[in-house]
From Swiss-Prot:
Signal peptide: none annotated. One of the components of the core complex of photosystem II (PSII). PSII is a light-driven water:plastoquinone oxidoreductase that uses light energy to abstract electrons from H(2)O, generating O(2) and a proton gradient subsequently used for ATP formation. It consists of a core antenna complex that captures photons, and an electron transfer chain that converts photonic excitation into a charge separation. This subunit is found at the monomer-monomer interface. One of its GO terms (biological process) is photosynthesis, light reaction. InterPro entries: PSII_PsbM (IPR007826), PSII_PsbM_sf (IPR037269). Belongs to the PsbM family. It is a single-pass membrane protein. It is found in: Plastid, Chloroplast thylakoid membrane. This is Photosystem II reaction center protein M. Keywords: Chloroplast, Membrane, Photosynthesis, Photosystem II, Plastid, Reaction center, Thylakoid, Transmembrane, Transmembrane helix. It comes from the Eukaryota. The gene is psbM.
Length: 34
């Protein structure tokens, strides 16, 4: 099976970017609540 590096990077970014965005929002909300 051939590994497509661009597809792997695109998938990683597609998963990591929303996760990081939600994580930042969660941290900001938690900081404001405290």
């Amino acid at each position: 099976m051939e590994v497509n590096i661009l597809a792997f990077i695109a998938t990683a970014l597609f998963i990591l970017i929303p996760t990081a965005f939600l994580l930042i929002l969660y941290v900001q909300t938690a900081a404001q609540n405290n």
